[in-house]
Amino acid sequence: MKLSDWINRKRHNGGYGIQSPSSFFFITQVLKERLPYYSYPILDQAVGGNRAKKRHFRELFRITNYQQPANCISVGSATAACTMILAKPSVAHYAVTPTGLTAGRQSLLNEKGCHIVDSTEQLRTIIDKVGTIGMLYINTIDGADTLIRAALPHTNKESVIVVDGINRSKTAKLWWQQLVDDSATVITYDFYNYGLLLFDKDRIKQHYTLKR
């Protein structure tokens, strides 16, 4: 990471330098929340892996719990699908081409009523079915840019899109920057490993970069 990037992330770390009350609350009380959730043990078991991976998906859990989306769609990650369905089990869930679909994760998704589809071509059908996206998680898989472009017209002020792997490659960085600059997105967050896109047109367009 370049020194200038590190300084920028350091300046914003912990919510400092953020003037928007809603963004400050989101960062300090949601993203950096330290109190345990009752679902964490089940979540950690479903996620597996090291501490960093568990922290990453605990953040996704808290974001989902905070946003209270009307529906949840994950593309390219069974772990993300499990995370969102544990955080908000009462709405429709769709898992598109979920990589890492172990027997345990599939059992959890089936138990909670998640609709699992094996082709990204079906994402458009799912979006048409739900009408407006509640929460969409998408990994930087091949064709992800096209999928998100198809999703953007189906967002509103309550929608959130989580883009994983935004700094994974030069191509991913360029693609992420294009999304940040897009007129459809309003509030965007760069958490280094992943980014968030929000669409509330009542707010001023703003981008935040935080140290991970």
Segments from the language model and where they lie:
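A short alpha-helical cap/connector motif
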Residues: M1-K157, N167-R212
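Short beta-strand/loop segment that forms part of the nucleotide-sugar
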Residues: V162-D164
